[in-house]
Amino acid sequence: MIGTPLKKSATRVMLLGSGELGKEVVLEAQRLGVEVIAVDRYADAPAMQVAHRAHVVNMLDRVELGRIVARERPHLIVPEIEAIDTPYLLELEQEGYTVIPTARAANLTMNREGIRRLAAEELGLPTAAYRFAASIESFRAAVKDIGLPCVVKPIMSSSGKGQSVVKSMEEIDGAWTYAMEGGRGASDTVIVEEFIPFDYEITLLTVRHAGGTTFCPPIGHVQIKGDYHESWQPMAMTPAALAESQRQAKAVTDALGGSGIFGVELFIKGDRVWFSEVSPRPHDTGMVTMISQNLSEFELHVRAILGLPVPEVANLAPAASHVVLASEAAEEVTFSGLDAALSVPETKLRLFGKPDTRPGRRMGVALSFGADTDEARNRAEQAAHAVKIVTL
């Protein structure tokens, strides 16, 4: 049952994090008559521009967060980013609030140590060999133990911040410093991972809902410095690799529990599959599903968290996405080149409306169909590169 927005009967959803993914969640929730409250650390975030109400708070401050939760009394609390006091979500859940998918899932996936130990040590899923280090001395020992090349990540970060590949012993101290600068929260721990020479990596969007578990067609993607740059669907895989990917995705999402969509990242080499990471929310590489599927990842997430039916998910046609990035910092920008971008065949454009820019900030995405994924990728790249961001 869903009530009437802005009335006593309203079904209220509080979104913690109001970026471009959250904006799409807001729109899909509102299409089903849900009242949405958007929260983030800065004003005029994309989801705030379309929500019924918005609050600007430091979500790492449980006092501030608790104040707005008590004021709004949401039926569902939906984390959209990692920069949240996730231990406090556990307390809110104990008080009777519903956290999506669960407070435990949000807490575990915020921390690479928590989710890696769950996947590798509790569930026995194949992963890259890894070590954790909380000092420069233990970091050097971990790199020596894992071997070169290796991948270094803060245990708490997002969008590739603080991640690097160490190829020589001379790079160790710089990698440690970079990880410390890119980490989020008070933790000074990093994970050192074996470098896996994979053929490709995928996101397997996995939906837990009242009727069971549904998998979307696999999404191929390219990351640059640990951050999503382009994605496409479907990604061609062997039947054995797809089956193993689905097995691993179901195992980890079942362990996390709750309802909603999960972005499960996996490395693939031939028929072999390694678990990498999981996000208990819509995934940035999944933006391609806004055109590629009969139901986008945002529609699927909203249906699942509201307890509504989730039918079979179908890929409509080969499609791809490519990011539009800012190159410099500015408090206000304009966009040119839209005529050229939208003249690319079978292409759409999404500009996120972020209030300011910084180098490398994602400001939009181009979405394209093609006769195959190669053509779709080329079209999306052409359109994205046609967009010019002009600082004022």
Curated annotation (Swiss-Prot):
Broad enzyme group: ligase
Entry similarity comment: Belongs to the PurK/PurT family.
UniProt keywords, alphabetically: ATP-binding, Ligase, Magnesium, Metal-binding, Nucleotide-binding, Purine biosynthesis
Function description: Involved in the de novo purine biosynthesis. Catalyzes the transfer of formate to 5-phospho-ribosyl-glycinamide (GAR), producing 5-phospho-ribosyl-N-formylglycinamide (FGAR). Formate is provided by PurU via hydrolysis of 10-formyl-tetrahydrofolate.
Annotated Mg(2+) binding sites: 265, 277
Pathway assignment: Purine metabolism; IMP biosynthesis via de novo pathway; N(2)-formyl-N(1)-(5-phospho-D-ribosyl)glycinamide from N(1)-(5-phospho-D-ribosyl)glycinamide (formate route): step 1/1
Source species of the chain: Geobacter metallireducens (strain ATCC 53774 / DSM 7210 / GS-15)
Binding site for ATP: 112, 153, 158-163, 193-196, 201
Known partners and oligomeric status: Homodimer.
PROSITE patterns xref list: ATP_GRASP
Chain positions recorded as N(1)-(5-phospho-beta-D-ribosyl)glycinamide binding sites: 20-21, 80, 284, 354, 361-362
InterPro entries listed in its UniProt record: ATP-grasp, ATP-grasp_carboxylate-amine, ATP_grasp_subdomain_1, PreATP-grasp_dom_sf, PurT, PurT/PurK_preATP-grasp, PurT_C
Protein name, UniProt field: Formate-dependent phosphoribosylglycinamide formyltransferase
Cell cycle keyword on record: no
GO cellular component terms listed in the entry, alphabetical order: cytosol
Pfam families in the record: ATP-grasp, PurT_C, RS_preATP-grasp-like
SUPFAM superfamilies per the UniProt record, alphabetical: Glutathione synthetase ATP-binding domain-like (SSF56059), PreATP-grasp domain (SSF52440)
Chain ranges of the ATP-grasp domain: 117-306
Reaction equation(s) it catalyzes: N(1)-(5-phospho-beta-D-ribosyl)glycinamide + formate + ATP = N(2)-formyl-N(1)-(5-phospho-beta-D-ribosyl)glycinamide + ADP + phosphate + H(+)
Keyword Iron attached: no
EC code: 6.3.1.21
